[in-house]
Every structure is written in C-alpha cells, then in structure tokens.
Amino acid sequence: MNLTNKLCLIAAGTAALAAIPAAASAKEGPYIGLSGGVALPNDSNNSGAFDATVPATPDFGAIPADTSLGWKTEFDTGYAINGQVGYAFDNGFRVELEGAYTRYGVDRHSGLTVGGANIDGVDVAVLTRGAPAAGNPTVGAVIADGQGRVSNFGLFGNVFYDINTGSSFKPFVGAGIGYQWADVRFEPSGVDVADANDGGFAYQLMAGASVELSERAELFGQYTWRDRTDTATVPLNLLPANLGVETGQSIVSAGVRIKFGQ
C-alpha cells in the first residue's frame, strides 16, 4: 500500500470515528504512559547513486558519477520503547505527544547492483579497488555476513479514539504524524560501509485495547505501523555514494497509562 492510500485510510477512519456517539462514561483529564515491545522491521530495498567517479584500475573499469547502486537488507526482530504524555476528553478522543525509540540488528545483505547489474558473484576487489585474487571472497559472500544495526528515534503528535463498550475494556484506534531520525550502521563482515544518521517526516497508524485496573491506571496493548515519508539517506564510507534506507516497521507493544484529575 502506497503513502497516498494510507493517508486516505487515515482520513476515512477519522471521518468514521467522528460519527460514533461519544462515550457517556468517558472521563476527562491528563495522563502519562510508558510501553515497550518488539519491533518487526520490513526488509529494506536500499537504493542510491555514486556522487563521484570511482577511478579505473588495471583490473576494473571506472564507475561514473550518478551510476545507480542498491541492495536488499534483511533485519532481525528488535525492540521498542515508547513514552507518552496526553489528554483524554470526555467524548472518547485523546491527544498525546509520544517519544518513540526502536532498535534492530542487520541479518544479511544481498543482491548488490551497480548500474543495474548484479555483482554478488564478482571478486570483492571490484569495490575495494584492490587486485583480484583466487583467495578473495565474492561481493555476495562479504555482504551476506550482515552485522550492523538501525536505531530510530521519533517524536509524534497522536490522536486516538477510545470506543465505549460499557465495560473496563476499551478498543481504540489512532494515527500520528511527526519527525523521525534513523541512525544506520552497516558493517558486513566487519567492513565499515555506512555509519550515519538522517531525519525526516514520519507517520504512524495504531490500533489496540486497554483495560482499567483502577480509576487512575490502565493496561494497554497496541499494534503500530510506523514509517517515514521518505527514505533515510546516508553517505557510504566504503564508496563515494549515498544510499536510501527504508525504515518501515510494525511494532507490537504493551504498557500502562496513569491518569490524573479524572
């Protein structure tokens, strides 16, 4: 699903929620929350281009500036930590400011292409500009040994609607927009390929349910889809190139909210 379709779903969902009668038992007041869980990142189809010409050597031709490059990165399951400060209205709506952090490791890279040609089977010297040798590993063998990680930190403004069920159990849906920084470190086979960060606008869609423990506390579980509106663009250290890294992720979390003045 592309960004336009997701934004349309947000708008449609907001309109539908506005038509739901307000929960008679909803109480108004501020709250704070803390949650944690697992981050399930999508694979990243990294893409970029050389920003300078790689000179020719006796064994390999030059790689001109603006030549495309890319590869696929698969990630491990990671973790998520979130903190919220919000305000609940008596009509079922809530608004909140959320700080969100996720971190996950790199499993493997594969399918490195330069100018559209896959070079996984080529001597790694094509990238290091060293001399090819029978004992050298291939590009594919070097990048298959993942190593590295991606950390994301975001600040979001969220809007939720708690659905009144007439009990202490309340399903909810929500959406948020904000800004997210991605810190990308790629070190396949211990080679320092990338270590940089980049920020950009981001959005998230949420659904879950809460259960009241008391008048002041409630437990909640939540699913979140979070992504940026663009890729995280990071400069490469091994090559004179920039790479766009995708940061879309599902997050499954559980936490507690403490209510004040309600």
Predicted regions and their residues:
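Gram-negative (and chloroplast) outer-membrane scaffold detector with strong preference
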Residues: 27-29, 38-42, 84-187, 247-262
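Solvent-exposed loop segments that connect transmembrane elements
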Residues: 44-70, 110-145, 187-195, 230-245
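C-terminal or late-domain output modules
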Residues: 164-261
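Short sequence motifs at beta-strands and strand-loop junctions characteristic
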Residues: 65, 69-80, 147-154, 197-202, ...
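Cleavable N-terminal export/targeting peptides
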Residues: 1-28, 261-262
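Short glycine/proline- and aromatic-enriched beta-strand/turn motifs that initiate or cap beta-hairpins
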Residues: 22-87, 184, 257-262
